[in-house]
């Protein structure tokens, strides 16, 4: 049984390929730069957005399932149209081809940004009304709609969207990578003012969720939400990274009000709101179908920093 995986060279995709191989699946990689990664059985060119339909259909020959995790993210030079083309239109074209040619399931890896902005505070589940606040979130929501519509129009119900909170692991980018760099500082940090709490998930746990959704015996639901068992405070995340770097906590009890005023003054008010927002994902639906949320979030973050520190020391 063969699974087509897009985005397989990314830090999440690599874990998915590894988990699929360990479970006995053959893996076909679709990539814009078709170089065979470890443990892939074959590699094909990922067609461009304007490629003919036959190019997308050809990718699906011999494929049972499709896992689409390729995406445009954290690209400050990209326009709204760029995000929409890659995360929306291309996703829709893949889904239409898979609905026509692949016999199994289609999983689209999405993000909680498809439903809430970075400054949203509250609980998030599958029923959360989508209100994306940035180009990335709007494009991921568009990809969700196109995926489910493609399968619905083909009379099929074996496609699902898997929404993810921030994902950690080797090669991560975005806010978690920024926090890890910030934690690797000898200076005291005003973490007492960073009152936000976040649900996180590891790349390995994402891969385990993908494997479960591909193999579970019952039909797919259209939307799933993943996340670790326990959310982590921003201050705990930074402390875990510092522990991994071998640095003392060195937290400074700066009140939140002056920090908020300074952030607003320098045009960083939205970023400050994100650091103080609480976003808690409820993965109970996915857990009820056999996936097990991880419980050692902070230990994994510390180990991630420890490995980064070790590599940096060896490179010196």
Enumerate the language-model features and the residues they cover.
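Mid/C-terminal beta-alpha module of Rossmann-like enzyme folds, strongest
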Residues: 212-271, 302-316
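Conserved C-terminal active-site "lid" loop/helix of NAD(P)H-dependent oxidoreductases
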Residues: 203, 239, 261-293, 303
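Substrate-positioning beta->alpha
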Residues: 172-178, 192-214, 221-225
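Conserved Rossmann-fold NAD(P)-dependent oxidoreductase catalytic core, especially the SDR/UDP-sugar
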Residues: 93-135
């Amino acid at each position: 049984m063969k699974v087509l995986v897009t985005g397989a060279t990314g830090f999440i995709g690599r874990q998915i390929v590894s988990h699929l191989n360990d479970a006995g699946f053959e893996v076909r990689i679709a990539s814009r730069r078709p170089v065979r990664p470890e443990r892939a059985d074959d590699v094909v060119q990922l067609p461009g957005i304007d490629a003919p339909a036959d190019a997308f259909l050809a990718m699906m020959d011999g494929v049972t399932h499709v896992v689409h995790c390729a995406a445009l993210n954290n690209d400050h030079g990209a326009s709204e149209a760029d995000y929409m083309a890659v995360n929306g239109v291309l996703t829709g074209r893949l889904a239409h081809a898979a609905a026509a040619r692949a016999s199994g399931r289609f999983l689209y890896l999405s993000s909680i940004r498809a439903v809430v902005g970075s400054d949203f505070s509250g609980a998030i589940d599958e029923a959360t009304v989508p209100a994306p606040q940035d180009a990335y979130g709007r494009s991921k929501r568009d990809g969700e709609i196109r995926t489910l519509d493609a399968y619905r129009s083909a009379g099929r119900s074996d496609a699902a969207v898997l929404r993810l909170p921030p994902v950690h692991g080797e090669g991560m980018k975005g806010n978690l990578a920024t926090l890890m760099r910030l934690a690797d500082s000898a200076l005291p940090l005003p973490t007492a003012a960073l009152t936000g709490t976040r649900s996180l998930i590891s790349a390995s746990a994402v891969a385990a969720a993908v494997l479960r959704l591909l193999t579970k015996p019952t039909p797919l639901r259209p939307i799933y939400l993943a996340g670790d068992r326990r959310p982590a405070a921003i201050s705990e995340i930074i402390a875990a990274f510092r522990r991994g770097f071998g640095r003392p906590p060195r937290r400074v009890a700066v009140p939140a009000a002056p920090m908020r005023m300074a952030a607003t003054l320098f045009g960083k008010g939205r970023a400050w709101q994100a650091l103080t927002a609480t976003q808690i994902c409820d993965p109970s639906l996915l857990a009820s179908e056999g996936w097990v949320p991880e419980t050692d979030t902070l230990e994994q973050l510390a180990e991630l920093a420890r490995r980064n520190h070790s590599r940096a020391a060896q490179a010196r």
